[in-house]
């Protein structure tokens, strides 16, 4: 995540291939073509979060709740990347649901106006538009099966091209496959960001001629 932020914002956010290299939410201003926006780099998501990192994780949750667009970065070179993807989605849903339930139980919490004028505390993760970025395609490896091999196909037997077709068909959200380190498909990534953010901007400010 931090590598992608550094590349887009031309800043120097600490990036390391280890859990919790980012412990605080970092925000940078990014401009793609003529469109400026704020990009937040948050702490990574894992199952069974260590107690001493709970506060950092709460700050991440705050960023997710207030975001207009969620960028879910997945390390596709990891052998268990599909499980990691599901863990992140499940964790965000659980945390947002729990936080909303707590807030709704507190009568002094100021509620936002939702549909039909009813009180609505926070947006749910399902309402957040998102882009799934499969990173590290340069490190993706697989082992083709022999023609006479009748054993079931495993994850390590699936090529990157097959993986792309599968995930593009599976996800309702936009997804893209890149290598931040090798600068592969970065122009496509920027274009995708630009189009999605521009669409959000137009919906919010329909009479703004800025774009």
Residue ranges and their predicted role:
Residues 1-10, 79, 83, 93-211:
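C-terminal-of-GTPase-core extension/linker across diverse P-loop GTPases
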Residues 1-69:
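Conserved G1/Walker A P-loop phosphate-binding module
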Residues 39, 73, 133:
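Generic enzyme active-site microenvironment
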Residues 42, 76, 136:
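Walker B catalytic acidic pair
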Residues 65-70, 169-173:
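Short acidic (Asp/Glu) and glycine-rich catalytic loops that position anionic groups and cofactors
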Residues 72, 78:
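Histidine-centered active-site/metal-ligand motif
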């Amino acid at each position: 995540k931090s590598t992608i932020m550094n590349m887009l914002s031309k800043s120097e956010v600490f990036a390391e291939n280890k859990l919790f290299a980012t412990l605080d939410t970092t925000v940078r201003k990014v401009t793609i073509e003529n469109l400026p926006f704020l990009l937040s780099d948050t702490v990574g998501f894992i199952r069974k979060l260590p107690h001493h990192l709970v506060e950092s994780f709460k700050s991440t949750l705050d960023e997710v709740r207030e975001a207009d667009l969620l960028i879910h970065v997945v390390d596709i070179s990891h052998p268990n990347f599909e499980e990691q993807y599901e863990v992140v989605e499940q964790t965000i849903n659980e945390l947002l649901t729990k936080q909303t339930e707590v807030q709704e139980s507190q009568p002094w919490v100021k509620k936002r106006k939702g549909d039909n004028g009813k009180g609505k505390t926070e947006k749910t993760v399902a309402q957040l538009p998102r882009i799934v970025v499969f990173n590290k395609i340069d490190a993706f490896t697989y082992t083709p099966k022999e023609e006479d091999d009748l054993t079931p196909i495993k994850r390590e037997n699936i090529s990157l091209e097959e993986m792309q077709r599968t995930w593009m068909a599976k996800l309702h959200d936009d997804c893209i496959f890149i290598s931040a380190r090798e600068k592969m498909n970065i122009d496509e990534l920027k274009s995708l960001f630009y189009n999605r953010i521009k669409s959000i901007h137009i919906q919010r400010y329909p009479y703004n001629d800025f774009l």
